[in-house]
From Swiss-Prot:
Inducers of expression: Transcribed in a circadian rhythm with maximal expression at 12 hours and minimal expression 12 hours later; has its own promoter. Protein levels are fairly constant (at protein level). Rapidly forms aggregates in the presence of oxidized (but not reduced) quinone analog DBMIB (2,5-dibromo-3-methyl-6-isopropyl-p-benzoquinone), an artifical electron acceptor for photosystem II that reduces the plastoquinone pool (at protein level). Aggregation is irreversible, and prevents KaiA from stimulating phosphorylation of KaiC.
Highest classification ranks of the organism: Bacteria, Bacillati, Cyanobacteriota, Cyanophyceae, Synechococcales
Swiss-Prot/TrEMBL GO biological process terms: circadian rhythm; detection of redox state; entrainment of circadian clock; positive regulation of circadian rhythm
Family as reported in the entry's similarity comment: Belongs to the KaiA family.
Known regulation of activity: Binding of oxidized quinones (produced as darkness falls) prevents KaiA from stimulating KaiC autophosphorylation.
Domain spans labelled KaiA C-terminal: 174-282
Consequence recorded when altering residue 136 to V: Extends the period of the circadian rhythm to 30 hours
Outcome (variant: residue 156 to A): Disrupts circadian rhythms in vivo
Source organism (scientific name): Synechococcus elongatus (strain ATCC 33912 / PCC 7942 / FACHB-805) (Anacystis nidulans R2)
A UniProt-annotated Pfam family: KaiA_N
Subunit structure: Homodimer. The KaiABC complex composition changes during the circadian cycle to control KaiC phosphorylation. Complexes KaiC(6), KaiA(2-4):KaiC(6), KaiB(6):KaiC(6) and KaiC(6):KaiB(6):KaiA(12) are among the most important forms, many form cooperatively. The KaiA:KaiB complex is only found at 20-24 hours in the circadian cycle (subjective night). Binds to the C-terminal A-loop of KaiC via a coiled-coil structure. KaiA and CikA compete for binding to KaiB(fs). CikA copurifies with this protein in the clock complex. Interacts with LdpA.
Designated name of the protein: Circadian clock oscillator protein KaiA
Phenotype of the disrupted gene, per the record: Not essential for growth on low light, loss of circadian cycle and rhythmicity.
Keyword hit for Cell cycle: no
Resulting phenotype, residue 225 to S: Induces an arrhythmic phenotype
Length: 284
């Protein structure tokens, strides 16, 4: 049986909170909701050893100031940043590091992915710890990096490994979240989420200045932690290409352009293979 994951959510929108609670309703998650930046800072200071993962909504007031204060106070934990306050579309995932170098980004419309992205955030933090924080950039790009903070991060990583059973991210995957073990309704929801995520990858694949890498990472995280077979990924790709082909035929245009998107499929599968490679525990 997997240990509970303690998640602290800083959210000031009732609608977003409800979406988060719906996605993380399983007994596996213990949620602490902070309705303001002040509440978050107070809770993080008094319960820093009881937070496994932070979910931070970028549209919250004083977001950057609060996150900066977390860094300066040495509260650096696995994190997911939702939305992007500096974008023309604040619902989209952020395009830059806002808290630390191991944070993951989700759009507000992608919150159904949270069960898989929480696992991914924990795994990424453990892989990169000690991570570079926003405070490091402020202090001359890390020239004055606090060694005590690095030590605290390593201690947190060790605590997570011991309590949650991380030897490699493969061993942390929750079998109850595997595609083959999901109830029919949940399986359909996952399939739809992956279709939507893959569509975003395809539509932005050849666009400059897109958030492509984050989109691919989000899709691969879902595929990996749900133990989705590569054949299913290929199926999702082919379904989308068939849909696009029908539209092109209706418009009287050539379907040859779709051949270029074979690169998209190869890229996504390569990322998934890399995720599996990294999951193999290092020999001791």
């Amino acid at each position: 049986m997997l240990s509970q994951i303690a998640i602290c959510i800083w959210v000031e929108s009732t609608a977003i909170l409800q979406d988060c609670q719906r996605a993380l309703s399983a007994d596996r998650y213990q949620l602490q909701v902070c309705e303001s930046g002040e509440m978050l800072l107070e809770y993080a200071q008094t319960h820093r050893d009881q937070i496994d993962c932070l979910i931070l909504v970028a549209a919250n007031p004083s977001f950057r100031a609060v996150v900066q204060q977390l860094c300066f106070e040495g509260v650096v934990v696995p994190a997911i940043v939702v939305g992007d306050r500096d974008s023309e579309d604040p619902d989209e995932p952020a395009k830059e590091q806002l808290y630390h170098s191991a944070e993951l980004h989700l759009g507000i419309h992608q919150l159904e992915q949270l069960p898989y992205q929480v696992d991914a955030a924990l795994a990424e933090f453990l892989r990169l710890a000690p991570v570079e924080t926003m405070a490091d950039h402020i202090m001359l790009m890390g020239a004055n990096h606090d060694p005590e903070l690095s030590s605290q991060q390593r201690d947190l990583a060790q605590r997570l490994q011991e309590r949650l059973g991380y030897l490699g991210v493969y061993y942390k995957r929750d079998p109850d979240r595997f595609l083959r073990n999901l109830p029919a309704y949940e399986s359909q929801k996952l399939h739809q989420a992956m279709q939507t995520s893959y569509r975003e990858i395809v539509l932005s694949y050849f666009s400059p200045n897109s958030n492509l890498n984050q989109s691919i990472d989000n899709f691969v995280n879902m595929a990996f932690f749900a133990d989705v077979p590569v054949t299913k990924v290929v199926e999702i790709h082919m379904e989308l290409m068939d849909e696009f082909a029908k539209k092109l035929r209706v418009e009287g245009r050539s379907e040859d352009i779709l051949l270029d998107y074979r690169l998209t499929l190869i890229d996504v599968i390569a990322h998934l293979c890399e995720m599996y490679r990294r999951s193999i525990p290092r020999e001791t």
